[in-house]
Amino acid sequence: MNFISDQVKKLSSSTPEEPDHNKPVEGTETATRPATNAELMASAKVVAEAAQAAARNESDKLDKGKVAGASADILDAAEKYGKFDEKSSTGQYLDKAEKYLNDYESSHSTGAGGPPPPTSQAEPASQPEPAAKKDDEESGGGLGGYAKMAQGFLK
C-alpha cells in the first residue's frame, strides 16, 4: 500500500521529480556529460529569447552569463553531432568558442537564475515605428536570421 500512496504523492506534487540517472554523481565533472535533448531545447529557448530581447534593444535585462552558457551547450552539441574532431579547423574553432563562452558564463553569471525584473522607466513616446520588412528579410531566414538579430548581443 505504501507503493501506491508514494506514487499518488509523486503524481500530485507540483514539481516533477528529476530521474536519478540525469543527476551528476558527486565528485565528477558535469562538463564531460553530453547535454540531453531537453537541456539542448532549454538552451535553444534561452538563446532565442536573448535574440528577441536584442532585437527589441532590451539586452541589458538579460543574464548574459546564462545566455553564454546556453550557447556553449549548443556549440558542444553541434560539435558532437556534427562529428567535428579537435584536429579539424572547424572543430578547433568550436572548441575555442565553447571555452570562451564557458569562461564568460563563469565570470559574468549573476546566479539569479533569470532575467532581472524590468525597470519602471516609461518608453519614450517619440520612438518611430519600425520600417516595413524588406523582401529579403521575410520569414524563413532560419538560423542566419537569429545570428543577425543577436549580432551585437555580447558586446
From Swiss-Prot:
UniProt KW Transmembrane keyword: no
GO cellular component: a single term: plasma membrane
Keywords: Abscisic acid signaling pathway, Acetylation
UniProt record, GO biological process: abscisic acid-activated signaling pathway; regulation of abscisic acid biosynthetic process; response to heat; response to salt stress
Source organism, top-level taxon: Eukaryota
Residues modified as N-acetylmethionine: 1
Keyword Cell inner membrane: no
Span list, region Disordered: 1-37, 85-155
Compositionally biased region (Basic and acidic residues): 95-106
Subunit and interaction comment: Interacts with DEK3.
Name listed for the protein in its UniProt record: Nodulin-related protein 2
